């Protein structure tokens, strides 16, 4: 019985790793869309978004089976519960990347033309996804804490982008709509960083049994 449980946990980890890889890829495509949006890119984003949604359903199904059939002990129960919370954040990461790609075509010009820091922000968010999933699979508390700290980097990028956008509007008020679209894109990337932080916090819960919302 325990061997079967361990095999199911391995399958759970494989699915989470795949979801994490898909999240990385969809963020990279969202970043690429800022400078080179095209129909093929948008199609690929939709495909990956659907794959993330399917991964969500698969992981949820594995977790429910483990909970209902295996009666996991406390530590295993935390790992399974954390996985169910994490996939919600990963699914939202996919949604927000799709929202970015949907927004870019309506802009009059390249989204990073006047403020390329957005691409650096996207890269930082992409790294957070990789580290957050690795932290879960390895049950690495130090890596989870590093992800939480990296959110400060994404937040700092957002603040700098926001100030730059205010400068764009002050310099030329007619560019207000462009600037607001730019701000929305930056906000989506900032939220992606927040979701990665949430994942890291659930890793902390799975390892220690404590979570900031439960204290």
Locate the predicted segments by residue.
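Cytosolic, long alpha-helical scaffolding segments
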Residues: 1-215
């Amino acid at each position: 019985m325990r061997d079967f449980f361990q095999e199911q946990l391995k399958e759970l980890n494989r699915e989470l790793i795949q979801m994490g890889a898909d999240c990385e890829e969809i963020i990279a495509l969202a970043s690429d869309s800022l400078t080179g949006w095209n129909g093929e890119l948008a199609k690929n984003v939709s495909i990956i978004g659907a794959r993330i949604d399917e991964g969500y359903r698969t992981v949820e199904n594995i977790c429910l089976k483990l909970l209902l059939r295996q009666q996991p002990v406390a530590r295993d129960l935390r790992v399974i519960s954390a996985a169910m919370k994490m996939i919600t954040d990963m699914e939202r990461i996919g949604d927000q990347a799709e929202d970015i790609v949907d927004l870019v075509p309506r802009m009059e010009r390249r989204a990073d033309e006047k403020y390329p820091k957005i691409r650096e922000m996207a890269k930082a968010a992409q790294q957070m996804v990789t580290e957050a999933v690795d932290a879960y699979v390895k049950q690495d508390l130090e890596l989870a804490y590093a992800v939480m700290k990296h959110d400060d980097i994404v937040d700092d990028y957002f603040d700098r982008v926001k100030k730059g956008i205010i400068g764009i509007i002050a310099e030329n008020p007619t560019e207000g709509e462009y600037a607001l679209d730019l701000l929305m894109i930056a906000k989506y990337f900032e939220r992606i960083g927040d979701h990665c932080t949430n994942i890291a916090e659930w890793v902390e819960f799975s390892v220690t049994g404590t979570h900031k919302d439960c204290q």
